[in-house]
Amino acid sequence: MLRFLISIILAATVGPAFADDMAGGSRVEVNGMKVYYEVSGGGDPLIVLHGAYMNIPSMGGIIPALAERHRVYALEFQGHGRTTDIDRPITYENLGDDVAVFMDAVGLEKADVFGYSMGANAGLQLAIRHPEKVGRLIVASAAYDIEGLQPAFRAFIPQLTVEMMLAMPFAEEYKQLAADPNGFPALVEKLIALEHEPLAWEADVKALETPVLVITGDADVATLEHSVAMFRLLGGGDMGDMGQPLPASRLAVMPATSHTAVITQTDMLISFIEPFLAGETPKGMFAQ
């Protein structure tokens, strides 16, 4: 979400958005693209999915932090970073399918998944369309329905233009990593079109059996009410301490946190993610 604002301030809030290929980077054929990815750490597999206009370096400290306990597979989406673009719209369904094909290509039968923003919605679609491939899913700054986005952002979407983005320093910096240095305008067109895609996944989310950790900032692009509604669709929101086990899915709200600040708070993210992946539940007076 919030592609435009991310593109303006990403370098300042996250760290170096562009760098040379890191050691261990590889490419694999996925649906006609050469997808760039990096593998780090050891343990159970965990796939990391970045947001729009982002790439592996611009995800900041979360990837190395997750790699302390997991075998992390971080990939770059269609037209992003070092991954090539193809003549195809960028949709959440397409991105989710790309991840499924990527998993087959690198020999991953099943993995846990962490996605941020666009990557979170792609992760939702992966779990919806390919549930057998996802163990546990963490979605940071996700939305399952267009009505759940903040009114101010929904009003801003019609104002987005390619020209607006081409005037940003980000447009020039894009060339430092891009598989096609001249491909930025085409990428922007596709991402603006993505903002206009209708989101209406309530029934699909409710049908999910995959455990999901919903993470949101308290000033995120989706309303707090929407994030709570997602948690309820996943079986959460009832009172504990009543003799019934807590649901497998969880909700975490990051205080004083805007959309673009979510991914910068590595320590807080890890404090939510690791207990969820380990299946650890705090114990109260009445055991759940």
Segments from the language model and where they lie:
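Flexible "cap/lid" loop of the alpha/beta hydrolase fold
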Residues: 121-129, 135-171
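Conserved HGGG/HGGXW glycine-rich cap/lid loop of the alpha/beta-hydrolase fold
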Residues: 33-84
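Conserved alpha/beta-hydrolase "nucleophile elbow" surrounding the catalytic nucleophile
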Residues: 52, 111, 115-120
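Catalytic active-site module of serine/aspartate enzymes centered on a nucleophile-bearing elbow/loop
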Residues: 247-288
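Conserved loop-alpha-helix segment in the C-terminal half of the alpha/beta-hydrolase fold
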Residues: 64, 218-257, 265
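Active-site nucleophile elbow and catalytic-triad environment of alpha/beta-hydrolase enzymes
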Residues: 188-204
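Active-site loop/oxyanion-hole signature of alpha/beta-hydrolase fold enzymes
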Residues: 40, 74-114
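Short beta-strand/loop motif that positions the catalytic acidic residue
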Residues: 208, 214-216
